[in-house]
Amino acid sequence: MYSFNASHSGSLDFGVMLAGGTYRLCWCSGMTMTGCAPADFQTDVGELTILGPFERQDRTCIAGVSCSVDAFDGLGLDLGHDRFMILSTCGVPGGSGGFGFGIRLGDVVTWESLSAPGGEYRLCWCYVFPNITFNASGGSSLSPGNESLPDCTVATDFLVDVGRLLL
């Protein structure tokens, strides 16, 4: 949902974390008695490209040993900034998941040891943003950190569900 304030700046909230891909942006005027139901978004206003892994990329590993799986397909994936975590539910701490970070080296993602019991888990992704800030003149500069961006160190940072891991 897009909303704006008196200074004409705005934000766009999709309500869900989208997987990598290209999406159509559609508009509804909101001039109906019911507001904007999904079927009312009939006007195509452009394209939105989300960088990240594609959905439904399932993998299998053996419990108790190092796990290496083929790297994930997606748009704009970055060897130096992609992080993967195995969780019971993406973005939710606790439960029986949470195996630390998968390290992407070239065409594989590796976890040192998977000691959880056999079962089905979720492969979750987070992108570590470089410490860059942008200013109004169009330039950029390095910054000591940005509190609004995830640092991909805790389960709640890993919101994008890439697929399932059978262990």
Task: Label the predicted regions.
Residues 24-28, 122-126:
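Extracellular recognition modules
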Residues 1-13, 97-112:
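Aromatic sugar-binding surface patches on proteins
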Residues 17, 61-64, 103, 115:
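Hydrophobic beta-strand core residues of beta-sandwich domains
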